[in-house]
Amino acid sequence: MVVVAPQGAGRAKLWGDAAVSKPFCCGLVVGKFCPLHRGHETVIERALSNCDEVLIISYTQPEFEHCDRATRERWLTQGFPNATTLVIDNAHLAQLCQRLGFADAPTLPHNDAPDDDHRRFVAWLCRFILGKTVDAVFTSETYGDGFAQVLTAQFQQIVPNAPPVKHVCIDPGRSAVPISGTRVRLSPHENRQFLSPAVYASFVERVCILGGESSGKTTLAQTLAQHYGSVWVPEYGRELWERKNGQLVLSDMLEIGRQQWQREEELACAANRFLFCDTSALTTLFYSQAMFGSVAPELRSLAQRHYAHVMLCAPDFDFVQDGTRRDPAFRDQQHAWYVQELASRSILYTLLTGTVAQRLQQAQSCLKRGKAQ
């Protein structure tokens, strides 16, 4: 998908009766953006302030963990809605070419390919995918001069009167924003000050804590969040149940799933390394089946969400009735359903047993190892 800026965005502004034009008509920013960091944002913001229109192109071959095509597109379109954004991988480029009627689609040059291969590829994307030429390219690298020369030559082959492309170099020594994508990928949490909250959220490991009623999952989520200096996501279903005095209807199940998802998205931006989720849409799916014998297709989709870690609290201590719960037999039924459902979905999980202190220790060991036991 090509995300096009809203009509009129970034155009010349009117002050009284006179139009105040920016120095360039169309600017270009190209990068892997793996991930998008403050240095990249500085370059893009400078381009937006100096150009009537800005094109942002992102590709990488190979891709990097947490920085897939869809994620990079989300970062860029949310952060810079007034730019035209093209984020591609080979599959996406092939789809675009087919849609535009090209018989063959080029493949992305490898990250280690010669500079001129990348420059000609970008020129082709500008002209044939975006239908644009540019008069400025913004970078923070010295190679930008050669980039501008190749773009000029490529554009003038097709549009002889295309203006020469000027290179605008911003903070080449990275003194203003001393960071690189490589450094962030190696240590995203130590370098989070160079990432916007929305980008950092993509590196947060989401920990899903499941368990039957009165199995200690809420206490565990709170305790883990406090231990790691992070945040936890409360169970929205319980809040809605209390608000409606226990009188839930089938449509409430989808609302619960959506709200739980939305809370995770919002709180991930405030998390530190881990986000502890007191339940997931999988629990809502269970209650939808148990209470109404039906599950909305969208809720089934929400229940497919991937978590970095899944922990299941065993029902191995006394059942505490707080007025909202059923009984120990239902708790056992729910636990058995989780075990079966997680197995059928091939989801690895850590079974937490014993006291709160013992469960906390087991959870910490799991997070330290980075995998279920």
Sequence positions of predicted segments:
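Nucleotidyltransferase catalytic core that binds NTPs
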Residues: 1-205
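Conserved lysine of the Walker
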Residues: 217
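Conserved nucleotide-sensing/catalytic segment adjacent to the nucleotide-binding pocket
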Residues: 247-291
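A glycine- and Lys/Arg-enriched "phosphate-lid" helix/loop adjacent to the NTP-binding pocket
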Residues: 292-358, 362-364
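Hydrophobic anchor at the beta1->P-loop junction of P-loop NTPases
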Residues: 209
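Conserved substrate/cofactor phosphate-moiety recognition/catalytic segment
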Residues: 222, 226-265
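P-loop (Walker A) phosphate-binding loop of NTP-binding proteins
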Residues: 212
